[in-house]
């Protein structure tokens, strides 16, 4: 089931220029790396009118695949060091990863887990 996945995709969306701050925080929480994508928010005018503040439309999306057991620590570290109340303005959410291909470090850990299960 999705609840029993071994890995999670952590998605952090930060204001442009703050990906290093977000990644440092994530690494302090246990992340081993990530991928940064540059993006632009849409529908910002309406959000600005609703919130009454100026919003930065240029964003950076930081993608981190981590073990499910590390997810909460990584997300908490990001929010503590670069969260929505900071200049980074980061929001974070996660999605279950049901399978991977080409992520060698994750595949190695999966192989080790299978070997451990077979030896017990």
Regions found by a protein language model. Name each.
Residues 1-120:
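Positively charged, small/polar-rich N-terminal and surface patches that mediate targeting and assembly
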